[in-house]
Amino acid sequence: MKKKIEMDGEAKGSCEEYEALSRRGFLGVTASAAGALSMAPSFVLGSEPSRSGNNGRDVLVVVYLRGGMDGLTAVVPYGDQALYSARPTLAVPPPGQTDGAIDLDGFFGLSPALAPLMAPYNAGELAFVQATGSPDPSLSHFEAQYFMESATPNMGHTGINTGWIGRHLSTVSPLGAGLFRGVGWSPMLALGLVGANGVLSIKSPSDFVFPGEPATEALRRQLYLEMYSQTIEPLKGAAASSLPTVDLLASVNFANYSPANGASYPASSFGEQLGYTAATIKADIGLEVAHIDIPSWDTHANMGPLTGTLATKLADLGAGLEAFWRDLGSDIDKVTVVVMSEFGRRVEENDSEGTDHGQGGCMFVMGGNVDGGQVISQWPGLDPVSLGNGNLPITIDYRDILAEILEDRLESPSAADVFLGYQPTYQNVTF
């Protein structure tokens, strides 16, 4: 068995704010939202079976890169010479040079660490979006993650404690019984998922079991239901649905899952969680959304875009996504993957061989119904006049991308409701 590579530690050279959030395990859930969730047993966030859904919807897989991923290293604007003036030691070289970017379209290139992603890109099932992000100007991890996941940038602290994914799920009928609509492969529920029933937050499927000896399981289940039948909602309803959800997950048989089509997931937490997601999708038990967090993208010092910290993290990201795409095969036609981060990095490198908090970044969108093989961008330029404050401007709001996916692929009746009145401008990222 391969030894699992631990990729979950704090980023070397990350800022004090990010390290504090990492130590607390902050994943975007505000105190009041977390308090509401804690009213249910820690392993129960299910709902009673409800209406049947439309099985034509895509499964949404959200990969959140916490800490602020450097989009200028991932998708390199090598055609903009100002990049090399701003980053004389950190910029990925142009295509054709040693350790150079892999050409995508004559202007943008892919980090060599992400080379596996050329397969879905060339197949027309992966697109990149550059100079995108949230218009929240704070550049604080805490603020940026909150506003991005609640989809409330520039609205201030309104007390909204639901996330854009949770609000989406609350506006559409469940697929199947609605017991297991969404999962966050994490000990804590990401704010983006808050606001819908049938959503679990578990680090591993092995964490969601009914413990004890098989010989006494029937009796223990009976006593468990009797105990919670005397309580109030939401405990009563959560307990009633928890056991069917345990049985539903047990039917997937994660322990014996074998990837298809020669796919090989990286031996990391990310690779493991992608494997769980693929197994659940193939089991067709009603999953609508999976959320995966990858921490430690805050690269203030010793960034290492070619051989160091960032290159290692990008390699894990690229290998995992390619394996997931390959493993799903034709099932990728009913899946859309979105990769996002709270902000990008400042254009100019700092004196610690790293980059500081910036604004515009990049997103990845992958799936069988993605208009891939392209970089979607309204490129503003990296010269000092175009930058203004030294950060890459946001020319495509991240909600434009998400709203298009929700309406085109997930049958959202109104993205404006999910995004609280925001009127998106579609970028033709999906068919």
Where do the protein language model's features map onto the residues?
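Conserved active-site-proximal phosphate/metal-binding subdomains
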Residues: 358
